[in-house]
């Protein structure tokens, strides 16, 4: 099967062509909502530049499609996590936007980054030395961001490294420092003392480095106020509809609608065991539906415990299987739900954040875990 033969086919991240008819589930992605979320964030930032974080294949939604939509809103800076993501994104968006590799470049991969026109994020003295060698080999200045560890203890130059560089006037020769940046650990908790501690540490560390624009705010950091905005904000989760202000109404539009197909319906009697391990036994006659969707599609076994059909909640019964989930559809009129019908897993009845709450995780994990077997349907954009 190929797209020329089947115009409804949609390539997944694995390259599989999955038509709507062939897929077990449909993932609808609203690019128009992503664009509106970007506009809302830009409005909060005033004149501050706003990038787009499209790592992990655009949080599982398709980095190339998301970046193209954001480009139409004027976004010209993107962040990915890995060099491979950056190379793929460069092929998708062309030569225009700047693309930064957040995790830094693996040793020896610098020529690939230079060839793809990527901007290194320098997280250590060793990476700085390697990027300077790349400058020498390229025979020209190369762009980079310098990331400092302001208190998250994850990525970035340690304070001692920054202090050592402060007295070395030649340390950054040949490097076009686009930004000095850091990352907030607790921005989704506005009253957490670490936010202000990190902001002050960031100001102290960047003052030791060559003068350059600064970037600190992630999605939630934007909502901490102008003192966190600096010259560039780097929203990711908020673009995709995840609430950047937990505990408050979500200021972002929802972006995804996930529906799974009913593979089979049946009636069972009291006492019948359901699913692997017979972890549930019917306490009376039940109507069941099995959907073609499971943990191989990224739905964690601990994730939200119900689907929805026409506003009616359909609880999961038994364990989530690799390719299927069993629903209790007894609340529906007999025959109302049939094979091939679609039930909602994410959408108006159950947001990404709702599903994450049921699973004891965060919306980022729900989206980034979504697998490649869906038919992906893009609207808007």
Curated annotation (Swiss-Prot):
Substrate binds at residues 154, 322. Its cofactor is pyridoxal 5'-phosphate. The active site is at residues 55, 276. InterPro entries: Ala_racemase (IPR000821), Ala_racemase/Decarboxylase_C (IPR009006), Ala_racemase_C (IPR011079), Ala_racemase_N (IPR001608), Ala_racemase_pyridoxalP-BS (IPR020622), PLP-binding_barrel (IPR029066). It catalyses: L-alanine = D-alanine. The modification N6-(pyridoxal phosphate)lysine is found at residue 55. GO terms for molecular function: alanine racemase activity; pyridoxal phosphate binding. Keywords: Isomerase, Pyridoxal phosphate. It comes from the Bacteria. One of its GO terms (cellular component) is cytosol. CDD domains: PLPDE_III_AR. GO terms for biological process: D-alanine biosynthetic process. Pfam families: Ala_racemase_C, Ala_racemase_N. Its EC number is 5.1.1.1. Belongs to the alanine racemase family. Isomerizes L-alanine to D-alanine which is then oxidized to pyruvate by DadA. NCBIfam families: alr (TIGR00492). This is Alanine racemase, catabolic.
């Amino acid at each position: 099967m190929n797209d020329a033969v089947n115009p409804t086919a949609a390539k997944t991240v694995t390259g599989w062509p999955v038509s709507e008819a062939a897929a077990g589930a449909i993932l609808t992605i609203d690019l128009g909502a992503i664009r509106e979320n970007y506009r809302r964030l830009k409005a909060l930032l005033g004149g501050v530049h706003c990038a787009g974080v499209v790592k992990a294949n655009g949080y599982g939604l398709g980095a190339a499609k998301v970046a193209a939509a954001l480009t139409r809103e004027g976004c010209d800076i993107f962040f990915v996590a890995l060099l491979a993501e950056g190379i793929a994104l460069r092929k998708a968006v062309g030569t225009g936007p700047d693309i930064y590799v957040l995790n830094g470049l693996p040793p020896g991969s610098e020529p690939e980054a230079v060839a793809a026109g990527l901007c290194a994020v320098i997280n250590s003295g060793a990476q700085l030395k390697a990027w300077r060698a790349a400058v020498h080999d390229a025979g020209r200045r190369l762009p980079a961001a310098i990331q400092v560890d302001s208190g998250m203890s994850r990525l970035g130059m340690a304070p001692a490294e920054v202090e050592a560089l402060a007295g070395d006037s030649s340390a950054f020769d040949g490097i076009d420092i686009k930004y000095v940046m850091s990352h907030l650990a607790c921005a989704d908790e506005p009253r957490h003392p670490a936010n202000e501690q990190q902001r002050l540490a960031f100001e102290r560390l960047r003052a030791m480095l060559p003068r350059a624009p600064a970037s600190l705010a992630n999605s939630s950091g934007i909502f901490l106020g102008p003192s966190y905005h600096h010259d560039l904000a780097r929203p990711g989760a908020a673009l995709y509809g995840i609430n950047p202000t937990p505990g408050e109404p979500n200021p972002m539009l929802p972006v995804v609608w996930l529906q799974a197909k009913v593979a089979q319906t049946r009636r069972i009697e009291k006492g019948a065991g359901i699913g692997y391990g017979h972890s549930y036994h019917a306490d009376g006659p039940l109507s069941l539906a099995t959907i073609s969707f499971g943990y191989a599609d990224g739905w964690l076994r601990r994730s939200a415990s119900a689907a929805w059909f026409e506003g009616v909640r359909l609880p999961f019964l038994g364990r989530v299987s690799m390719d299927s989930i069993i629903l209790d559809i007894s609340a529906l009129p007999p025959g109302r739900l049939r094979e091939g019908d679609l039930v909602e897993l994410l959408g108006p009845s159950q947001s990404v954040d709702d599903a994450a709450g049921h699973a004891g995780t965060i919306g980022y994990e729900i989206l980034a875990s979504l697998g490649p077997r869906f038919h992906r349907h893009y609207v808007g954009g």
